[in-house]
Amino acid sequence: GRPLTSTRLKTVTLLLDAPLKKGAAVIEAEYSGKMNELMRGLFKARGRNEGKEESWAFTHLEPTHARRVLPSFDEPDFKATFRLTLDVPAGLQPLSNMPALSDVTKNGRRVVTFAETEKMSSYLLAVFAARLAPKSRKVGKTVVTVWAPPEQLKQADFALDAAVRALGFLNKWFAYPYMLPKLDLVVSPDFASGAMENWGAILFRDASFLIDPKLSSDAAKRRVAEVVSHEVVHQWFGNLVTMGWWNDL
């Protein structure tokens, strides 16, 4: 067969020489891509390391930006499992939707392989690599962790408490507990949206997440609590139960 490429739609249509036979079929594709600074797809954020600027990587794939990162069916009603390995500079923390199965640092590189995801829409796939520190609490069997730059970690306490409260409440409200073994709440210094509900690895803009207990207003705290609760609810509405297309929202 041969591929037809649309630069406008960013799609590839495969024309086959013969009809597909009933049963399983496999498409293999070699590809490469680039990080951008558009804050969609796989994008570059400007972090800090000992006072110097450093490039960090995050993904924002909603609504149809997964196709900027990897060949996939990225319409939300198509769901798949994902197996992911990240190879990043040794000083950075790789994160994704699921917990790490292996974590090896050698020759200045850190290679982390993650557990296979639940079946999910591709717009929820998370790929992060940044200089972040964790702080965790448990809700039942779920480990809830905030990831923030080390110098800002104390400012994530309020959001961590909000996430723990929301997750505990929603587990009881739905009578269908959160499915994944972990829920990460990750801070990015550059992000166009307030937050993105990637399953198991929610991404937040720092201004929508960090609270200084001495300086932040009650209105700022209320806003952070609303954003965190909104994204935790999405772990059920959107992630577990998903619309067929974006006009169903």
Predicted features and spans:
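A surface-exposed beta-strand-loop module
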Residues: 1-49, 107
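Solvent-exposed beta-hairpin/edge-strand motifs
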Residues: 1-2, 53, 91
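Short acidic, glycine/Ser/Thr-rich loop/turn "cap" segments at secondary-structure junctions
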Residues: 13-14, 66-69
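Short glycine/serine/threonine-biased micro-segments
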Residues: 31, 198, 236
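N-terminal, polar/Ser/Thr-rich
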Residues: 50-56, 76
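Hydrophobic helix-coil surface modules that form long, contiguous segments used
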Residues: 59-64, 71-229, 246-248
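Catalytic Zn2+-binding segment of zinc metalloproteases
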Residues: 232-247
